[in-house]
Regions:
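Proteins that catalyze or organize thiol-disulfide redox chemistry
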Residues: 1-100, 104-160
């Protein structure tokens, strides 16, 4: 139903606008310490989060571990809203821990070529991009606007 879709989009836009002042305070300022080549613009990785690489994603998947891929950038307002409103909530973090989900975060702040290639492989030209790779089964691409319920529903094992 288009009306529901427009309603959700409008709600997301209003939430982003309400959070914009606080999010801009967290964004890197021009002239601030430049991001390093290995870990551009984002703050330190949260506990339980690792830096993204396709090799690490393959290794975790081959070991039967569920993986949540979070492709983001310091300048991406949608990414910042999703982090605050969906990914970093107590409920989402508790579910990630409960199901043993490992998060791999890719920082595209300075357009990392390896991340660009990964995005293109999945038909995307930019961030945010979210991918859940279950321990067994096909990967699931999540929408660009997240909610805690959507993330938790996606990572919850359906074979239990």
């Amino acid at each position: 139903d288009c009306t529901a879709l427009y309603g959700v989009a409008l709600l997301g836009l209003l939430a982003a606008m309400a959070l914009l002042p606080a999010l801009l305070e967290q964004a890197p300022q021009a002239g601030a310490n430049p991001p390093s080549a290995s870990g551009p613009g984002l703050s330190a990785l949260p506990s339980g989060t690792e830096a993204f690489s396709e090799e690490r994603l393959r290794a975790l998947h081959n070991a039967g571990k569920p993986v949540f891929v979070d492709m983001t950038a310091a300048w991406c307002i949608t990414c910042l809203v999703n982090e605050r409103m969906a990914l970093n909530t107590q409920a989402t973090q508790a579910a990630m821990a409960r199901y043993g989900v490992i998060t791999l975060r890719g920082d595209w702040t300075q357009r990392n070529p390896a991340i660009t290639a990964f995005l293109r492989k999945h038909g995307r030209d930019g961030v945010p991009f979210y991918l859940f790779v279950p321990a067994h089964g096909a990967a699931v691409v999540l929408p660009q606007i997240l909610t805690p319920g959507l993330v938790i529903g996606t990572i919850t094992p359906h074979d239990k």
